[in-house]
Amino acid sequence: MAQFFKPKKKASVNTKHLSVDVVRLDHNGAGIAFVDKKPVFIEGALPGEKAIIQFIEQKKQFSRAKLIKLAQKSEKRQTPICQHYHECGGCNLQHLQHEEQIVAKNEKLQELMKKQGVSQGEMVQPIMGEELSYRRRARISLMINKQTNQLDFGFRKKQSKAIVNVRHCPVLVQELDQHLESLFTLLNQLKGKKNLGHVELVQADNGSVLLIRHVADFNEKDHQALVNYCEERNLILYLMPEADVLNHVRGEEPFYLIDGTKIYFTPKDFIQVNRKVNEQMVEQALSWLDLNENDSVLDLFCGLGNFSLPLAKKVKTVVGIEGVDDMVQRAKLNAERNHLSNVSFYQANLEEEASDQVWASTKFTKILLDPARAGAAGVMETVAKLKPQTVVYVSCNPATLARDSQLLIQHGFKLTRLGMLDMFPHTGHLESMALFER
């Protein structure tokens, strides 16, 4: 007998306005209220506020709602610094005083560790940099506006592919922010502007970098206009005609300094966006490892050598492991350029068990790891089996840090220090550092 497909009825959403009391923030910075014992997530609401909301999504376990207005405001609320704040998808906590953002993130970090049954040890003071003008990297979205035939130039709207036109961003370092207006004007004048994909701006220690992604070659006039613009402003220029092709057109090779070491990079490479916090982060990690000249250190998820190269100046040997081979090759070159012969780099998939790797049979006294948001579940068994004296875990996701901490504790480690890094002020992103000792 034939069976006919019957599409499920789309769940209806109660669109009536409702008054709720906001009790806390979630790990992304949204306010949480409870309706019939079910959590409701409200972007833009703060603890202690009475909010008038409208549901936009209702599920079995939770709901999401739009903030209509505030019947009662928190004393910790402030006027957002940016004129685009309520549209732009970048920052989401500018309505909360910065010092209160720190408090909320600290509480969230401790809450997640406690939830996983991890005893936190000493809670150290947060690492902080500038509240504004801290981002040394930005990706500018571009799109032809069909109504005006001009480029939309800026950042994506909240939960949308549409673009908020931006000519000034208060969290960008001033060296980059100053170019937004003139860059918009230049790109709009190009004959081939419809072939533009996106733009990236990166602030290196030896200049500002402009990367232009394009899907067709520029004509000679457009190409020269780009070169002239960069020469007038002393910008380092890269053109990217394909996803895996990067052409260095003018300027020096970009680098940044960390602990007196030059880290060369391309605008495709990952680097930490907050220079001041990165410098303090590396300094604290090296301090927590309590290094001596006889130590052998393993640096997992090492990237270009942000930790590995400063480590190599203080210990006997360093081994850096990274999943992206291009970055491994550049890390090796960075070691050579800094005349560091006691550090070696290997490519490995750290999402998988690594005990059969050559480097995993080495005796390491200390281990540092700095994984992406997914954490380091694949390599934690290897870390535990290596039995180092000390492990420093740098995390950009407290949930995966809490999860991975459990395995170390099961293998006899104790979490002795925990601290927050204010890498991304005015956002819900929470970075942290944990020290484990046996």
Curated annotation (Swiss-Prot):
PROSITE patterns per record: SAM_MT_RNA_M5U, TRAM, TRMA_1, TRMA_2
A Pfam short name: TRAM
Leader peptide range in chain numbering: none
Binding locations of [4Fe-4S] cluster: C82, C88, C91, C169
TRAM domain sequence ranges: 10-69
Gene Ontology biological-process entries: rRNA base methylation
Active site (UniProt): C396 (nucleophile)
HAMAP family, alphabetized: 23SrRNA_methyltr_RlmD
Protein's recorded name: 23S rRNA (uracil(1939)-C(5))-methyltransferase RlmD
Species this protein is from: Aliivibrio fischeri (strain MJ11)
